[in-house]
Structure formats: structure tokens, C-alpha cells
Amino acid sequence: RDSSTSRGLGDVYKRQIEMTKGEYEEIGLEFETYLMDKQHSCRNKCIFCFIDQLPKGMRESLYFKDDDSRLSFLFGNYITLTNITEHEIDRIIKMHISPINVSVHTTNPELRCKMMNNRFAGDTLKYLKRFADAGITLNCQIVSCPGINDGDELVRTLTDLENLGVNMTAIVPVGLTRYRENLYPLVPYNKETAGQTIDIIEKMGDECVKKHGRRIFFPGDEFYLLAEREIPSPEFYEDFSALEDGIGMIAYLTDDVGWKLEELDADESLCHKVTIACGEGVFPYMKRIMSMINEKFPNITINTRAIKNNFFGGGVNVSGLVTGGDLIDQLRDDDLGDRLIITSSMLRFENDLFLDDVSTDDVERELGVTLVPVNNNGNDLVEAVIAGKD
């Protein structure tokens, strides 16, 4: 049944259609875009925003700051709640859209306004309580900045979030590039301050385990690398629900590689050579993982290379921000063997471009090697290493 109304040229045209379909039958409709309209952009000017620290000349899509509650539900994007209307809040609650992922950073209203350069940022924290009271699952993120929202402020924030009954909170250290001219003077974490932050998060997480049966608060892997501490065991991370935030990735990969190797028989006949390239931060653990593989396949030569991030500079040392240009510059004179293995997180969704717009074809051509992007799991990594030449 089609019920249409129109008031003439230029007026609003509204159509209501009722359809009937069989049980389990597809409705047969597709939207042109998954959001059906434009993405909502961010209205904040956060003092720690990574996008504000990007160099000029990168592809335009990298400079877009989204802050859209629909993307939170669809893809797990974090939203700040400064760009959401009462109507949208009511709709989320009415439709029980869950989970919602929120960039909290601090529950101190005045400090949140300062950190996000938005005078309304403190007011929107009330939405957290409304969501929690409605039974909406809340996953939270805190970008921790030394001397600003760490220490006692972090304790306050975690206490408030625990009392709200949030599902999970990922705490990650601020990332600083060399492109910070005219930006807020932030300082990076060091060994001492990273260790102090780990102690706070672990202590409060341990208390949550005793009271609620789950940890709730998780420090990013980068904190442990900065503090030069061992990564916790896989059990610490429970269901590994925050891998996309850099929480537990090293423990997950190490454990998953171990399980994969248990399924395979040792094979001394494999005698090819491969290179695996990663960020400087994870390099010691990647060396350890490659040693695990070598124990089972001793005649495979594995060249593990840490790539210094000259493109972003600063303290950026994570694998996902390694660029194609840095790979080419630093591996040009290496004997790379049959294939160069990288994490697929270095590439955009289509797996064809690095952040600096260097393509995978460019890297293969310049280095004369087959480039093999792998996902962050043991099966893909082990198979890529033992496969040899294509």
C-alpha cells in the first residue's frame, strides 16, 4: 500500500509504503549509503586530537573527524556525546541501540571542557547516566595525557565509570607526532609515568574483579611498552573485547600463534626466507613470536625489522602507523627473502594504500618483494611465514 503526499514543486515530498513478506524472506531494499545521509562531524577541538597532528598533503578523507552515534553502533567508533541531540538520545533509548562507545577522557566536567575545547563537553556526561539507566551497554575510552587527566583525575574518572556500571573502559596514552606547532603543549609518557598509570588501572581493575567478577578497566599495550614491563597474560584481558583500541593485541597474538603452532607438525624441510616489518614498540615481542615459529620450523630464516616512524616522528612507534615510504627507505638495502609480511592495519580498508598514499604496488616494485598483509591473528601470521615464495 502506497500513501503519498505532495504540496507542489519545491515542497517536501513524503511517501509511506507498507510491504508484506514471508518469514525469513529478504525485504529486497538496499540503502545507497549505510548512514542514509552525511556523517556527523566532530565539533570539538581536543588538545590531544591525532588528526590535528597530521602533516599537510595527505588524502582528504584522513582529515575528517567523525562523531556519529550511528557509526558507534555500526562499526564501534567512539563518540564524545557533544554532537548528539535530545531526539537522538531518546531514539537510542527507545530502540535500545547498544552498545554505545563513548570517548570520555574525564568525568570532571570542567576538565572535560578544557580538554575538548568545548564549553558544553561537561554537560553531556549526563547522557552517560541516562544510557546506563536505560540498560544501554557502555564501552568507554580515555586518552590519558600526563599531568592533565592522569593520577588523581584518572582515579576519579574510573570510580565514576564503575559506579555507572559501564561494560569496559580502554585507557590509552596520548599519541604525539612531530607536527604540533601552535597546538597545546602536551608531554609524552615516559617509563616512570607510564608505570604509575598502569599501577592505578591495574589496582582498580583488580578491585572490579573482586566486586563485579570482571576487570572493566584495561591499559593499552603501549603503556607496558613505555614502562618496559611485561605484557599481562591472556587471562587478564578476559574476552579481548578492546583489541581495536590496542588493548591486549600482543597477548592475543602471542597466545594465538602458540595455539596455531600446536596444530602443526615440525617441518625441517621448509628453508625459505621471509621478512616481517613492525613498529619499534612491539619489536621485542615480535622477535619473541618469530622465535616461537622458528622452534617448529628451524630452517626458515625470519628477518624481523623494526621500522622507525620518520613520517610522523615524535613518539609514534606503533605498527599500524608505519608508512609505505618508511618501509621503502629502511628496507631498500635488505635481503628481504621471498616475502615481506606486515600487519594489515598499516593499510586502509581496501588493503591497497598506506597512510602516506604509497601503494602496496609501489612497495613491491621498489623493494622487489611480494608484500603480504596479515590480520592480527596467529593463523594468518604463521601461515604467511611458513608459506614461502608465492
Specify the residue positions occupied by each region the protein language model found.
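Structural preference for beta-strand elements that scaffold enzyme active sites
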Residues: P99-N101, T137-N139, M168-A170, I216-F218, ...
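Conserved Radical SAM active-site core
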Residues: R15-G165, G175-M204
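Radical SAM enzyme core and accessory elements
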Residues: R1, E228-D390
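Short helix-capping segments at alpha-helix termini
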Residues: L164, C208-H212, N294-N299
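Short, structured coil segments at secondary-structure junctions
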Residues: G8, G165, E366-L367
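Flexible glycine/acidic-rich beta-alpha junction loops that bind and position SAM and/or redox cofactors
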Residues: I148, G165-E192, H212-E235, N309-G314, ...
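Generic beta-strand/beta-sheet core signal
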Residues: S103-H105, Q141-V143, V172-V174, G220, ...
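Single conserved hydrophobic/aromatic residue that forms the stacking wall/gate
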Residues: D2-Y13
